[in-house]
Design a protein with these regions (language model features):
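A conserved beta-strand element that flanks and buttresses the S-adenosyl-L-methionine
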Residues: 126
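Short glycine-dipeptide loop
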Residues: 149-155
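Short alpha-helix
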Residues: 196-214
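Core SAM-dependent methyltransferase catalytic element
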Residues: 215-240
């Protein structure tokens, strides 16, 4: 399926992850296998799958090379979207391909910020290493995912925490983080948005804000990878 209405985020990803980069990225997958961080993400996604009534339908937002396809359990049909055709080509031969149990995988070349799926199409939408990292996690995207989920469906995703060692803790950032809670509403929100880089980082408080209405947060934990400190969230769409 062709990409539709690319945003600047999708265009940037498609440009960055060209054929050469995608091949190197896929080679990096092989080196990640067995590391504590990778195993932590796999165990988390498997646990999320265990909460869903099998068989169920899933969407991978920003699937990349299909690094986590092997973690899925009980999935009847998987849709995997990415803005890079080169990454999708690599995802056809993902890490631990012999462990992938999903019978039907549909690859979609598209921008997750603008591509549309049917309302109520999925029981699980998941995204690892994309949201609040390469793509801003903001209310419009949360609303899109909510629309795509069936009642009671789950949205499982990682973010980069603003306290991650990978983020330079400049004096301005430290000052902004310390004074933001004491400022009046509009100014506090503006400064918080600056600290969170317009949605490219998200801490527990920001996740709770985004999922305060129409969702129930089932779990919200931290995980340290080789690159970042992450939040791992599972939010469930309201049944009624």
């Amino acid at each position: 399926m062709p990409a539709t209405h690319p945003t600047r985020w999708g265009t940037k990803a498609a440009s960055l992850y060209d054929k050469g980069y995608a091949a190197r990225y896929r080679s990096h997958d092989d080196g990640l296998a067995g590391t504590a961080a990778y195993d932590g993400f796999v165990a988390w996604l498997q646990e999320v799958c265990g909460r869903c009534a099998a068989p169920f339908d899933a969407l991978d937002l920003g699937c990349g090379t299909g690094r986590y396809f092997c973690a899925l359990r009980g999935v009847r049909a998987l849709v995997a979207i990415d803005a890079s055709e080169a990454m999708l080509a690599q995802a056809r031969h993902p890490l631990h391909q012999d462990q992938v149990t999903v019978a039907a995988v549909t690859m979609v070349h598209g921008d997750l910020m603008s591509h549309e799926f049917a309302a109520g199409q999925f029981d699980l939408v998941y995204s690892i290493g994309v949201l609040a990292e390469h793509v801003p996690l903001q209310p419009p995207l949360v609303a899109r995912v909510q629309r795509w989920l069936r009642p009671g469906g789950r949205f499982a995703f990682s973010t980069v925490h603003p306290d991650s060692r990978s983020i330079p803790q400049t004096p301005a950032r430290r000052l902004g983080s310390s004074i933001a809670p004491w400022l009046p509403g509009p100014l506090r929100r503006h400064l918080r948005d600056r600290v969170l880089a317009g949605g490219l980082y998200a801490d527990e408080d920001r996740v709770r804000e985004l999922f305060a209405s129409g969702w129930a947060i089932e779990s919200l934990v931290r995980l340290e990878s080789e690159a970042h400190l992450h939040c791992l969230c599972v939010a469930r769409k309201a049944i009624v």
